[in-house]
Amino acid sequence: YETCKTYLKQQAKFLMLLWAFIAAVIVVYFLLLEHMGAKVLIILLFSLVGMAGSFGVAWYGIRVNTFANSRTAHASLRGSPWETFDIPMRSGMSIGMVLISVELTLMLFIMLVLPGDLAGPCFIGFAIGESLGAACLRIAGGIFTKIADVGADLMKIAFHIKEDDARNPGVIADCTGDNAGDSVGPSADGFETYGVTGVALITFVLGAVPDQTEQVQLLVWIFVVRVVMLIASFVSYLINNAVAKARYGTV
């Protein structure tokens, strides 16, 4: 986990550098071309919130997955089929529930707490930020995986050591890269996808439906369906967990 943490800290520095360039583009477009005035500050603030959301979910995901991988490996050594099934399921469900819950909370906060004239800029900034974070974490994670893999193979050939020899530091980097590519990227990507589709639906409703009463009804419907989906996923997990435990818990 320490190597994964080091990777994420480096990613955070790169994200802030990239955000500085995107922030400059936002200021030029929304302030100088669209003349949105002080609302540009709201867009910039919520772009940071969206980016922090993607990064936070990715950090949580890699932390849970790293420890879950270790515990699953030890459970398999004990010959426990139920534990080797239950630990990954619980960790995956935990990440999914946190991801969706954080996203829903942030979007509902924008919709219900902030003034209506600020909601639009907030959603614009939020969508930009989470897309930036997810794209960077997804792409950079994949690139890091490939570089670490190639580096480990080169050291293996140069020093005539085995595939996963602990003396090869590239092996540890490769494991970190696998976690980065298979955990950090999908977690941030899921957060971004869920948020951007929500913003797109809200934009479509406000732009395509002229009647304000119907707009409110449709917006409420969007969030009710999302909450129901969250509850249904959790109930499905509990049912699956109960059935699996009844069948394999005593094996």
Task: Give the location of each predicted region.
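Hydrophobic, small-residue-rich transmembrane alpha-helices and their short perimembrane loops
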Residues: 1-251
